[in-house]
């Protein structure tokens, strides 16, 4: 299997998996044009689309792609049923695509119906988990997002985290504002800064490394707890997550 990223809009990535035969899976095609260009350039044959949630920058290209390739099966959560989804999937179910089983993981928070797809080592996590950050809470609660991230963080160390946006540099600036002396965060920030200066992608990331540099996955880390305790005493990890998310919203 080959993993490909297609830039779209200002900072979106549309992920495409293809096999040796050229069959492909498309994830969150917010815009059809760059996908169609990539299909033509690589002689891919689209078999399926995965949708993680209903926001337009993730579903906007579905209609045009299905019109061009009517054989495509469109998988998505209930909230995408009016966005072109032909096969609604929910937590605990599997989607069998390109000879691989993808587990569906419910990850409410960014939206209430958000889902992710996992087939080792690939995690397509939409707007739930970003490198160095997590999605804004447009519909869900901090508690829901905390639990969603906990699920994803428990996946195997070698998981490739395929996020839907290039937010890594801004996320790491925020992480440095919280833990300015953390060696892992400083090292990763320098690496990301160099990549972005060359207009290079920072994704996918390996989950084992992500756990070290993403403050939203470190709510039980003593250094982070000490920082938060300087401002307010919060006993539960979920409360510390909510504090971080509120800080990031204002950053």
Curated annotation (Swiss-Prot):
Cofactor comment: Binds 2 Zn(2+) ions per subunit.
Cofactor(s) needed: Zn(2+)
Listed Pfam families: HAGH_C (PF16123), Lactamase_B (PF00753)
Residues the record lists as binding Zn(2+) 1: 53, 55, 110, 127
Function: Thiolesterase that catalyzes the hydrolysis of S-D-lactoyl-glutathione to form glutathione and D-lactic acid.
Binding-site positions, Zn(2+) 2: 57-58, 127, 165
A single GO BP: methylglyoxal catabolic process to D-lactate via S-lactoyl-glutathione
Protein name per UniProt: Hydroxyacylglutathione hydrolase
Alphabetized UniProt keyword annotations: Hydrolase, Metal-binding, Zinc
Family, as annotated: Belongs to the metallo-beta-lactamase superfamily. Glyoxalase II family.
Record flagged with keyword Lipid biosynthesis: no
EC number, UniProt record: 3.1.2.6
Complex formation: Monomer.
The keyword Zinc appears for this protein: yes
UniProt cross-references to InterPro entries, sorted A to Z: Clx_II_MBL, Glyoxalase_II_hydrolase, HAGH_C, Hydroxyacylglutathione_Hdrlase, Metallo-B-lactamas, RibonucZ/Hydroxyglut_hydro
GO molecular function: hydroxyacylglutathione hydrolase activity; metal ion binding
Enzyme class: hydrolase
